[in-house]
Amino acid sequence: MTKAVLTSISQLALKALLYEVSLSPKPGLVDRFDNGAHDDMSFMTFIDSMIALSPFFQAYIETGFAYAKEEPLLLFNRLRQLGQKAEETMFCATQGINTHKGLNFSMALLLGATGAYLARTPHLMTDLGCFSKEDTLAICRLVKPMTAHLIQADLGHLNTKKEFTYGEQLFVTYGIKGPRGEASEGFTTLTNHALPYFRQMISQNDPETSQLRLLVYLMSIVEDGNLIHRGGIEAWKGVKADMRLLLQQDLSTTDLRLALSSYNQCLINQHLSPGGAADLLALTFYFAFLEKLL
């Protein structure tokens, strides 16, 4: 019974990734229609990546459930070790292409936290239908003590390094903390902005319209390391401003699709891809499935 429930939840994480890549059009991003601003990956590359990651999603939630009483840092270390194996498997499946590195990190923590939370709230194991936004918030808050050390541990000693990952380079150059920062704050962008916005949208619109509007909203607010890495601070600010204007127009679904298709070409021409917004889109979908919003 327990394993079946945990398996079903891990499948929601996979479903969230499938919904994210399938939502179309997504400016600058891989979707069903084209590869966005990416010349090294396609929709099929994402499918390969998701198949590779899927067994690890189950391992994350089972680890959280099994070690719910463990010190947060110890649980984090278990999840990170699993996450590193998942990352290696992903790169093997994609021939070295980074499709989900940051999202895998976030999913490891959130699925681990979901497992730990379910171990402490056994009533949810028998009735996931009563999963609420308060449960979502509690899960995200569990990540904070697990990752309180993370910025200092991972980014506090970069002055001794000569070569950086692109995430480290963003921190050195701009102070952008990326997925580590989001996790160490308990995913506040997700709980304070993305999910409240989506709950409102889905109560007023059909699922596709709600998802497209959520993407635009996220592009208008997210500190997007992918955009900054590719185009710098000014390019990122420009995308945010453009998306704020698009939101203000309150377009019909048909007109919104047309506007996003046009903006897709704009971002392709500038080689810009809002990958940070895409990751938060997938994380929002995961909790939307748990809360039965979708």
From Swiss-Prot:
A GO molecular-function descriptor: ATP binding
GO biological process: prosthetic group biosynthetic process
Catalyzed reactions: 3'-dephospho-CoA + ATP = 2'-(5''-triphospho-alpha-D-ribosyl)-3'-dephospho-CoA + adenine
Entry EC no(s): 2.4.2.52
Gene3D superfamilies: Triphosphoribosyl-dephospho-CoA protein
Phosphoprotein found in the keyword field: no
Record-linked Pfam families: CitG
Record PANTHER family: 2-(5''-TRIPHOSPHORIBOSYL)-3'-DEPHOSPHOCOENZYME-A SYNTHASE, TRIPHOSPHORIBOSYL-DEPHOSPHO-COA SYNTHASE
NCBIfam families for the chain: citrate_citG
Family: Belongs to the CitG/MdcB family.
Protein name, entry field: Probable 2-(5''-triphosphoribosyl)-3'-dephosphocoenzyme-A synthase
Upper taxonomic lineage: Bacteria, Bacillati, Bacillota, Bacilli, Lactobacillales
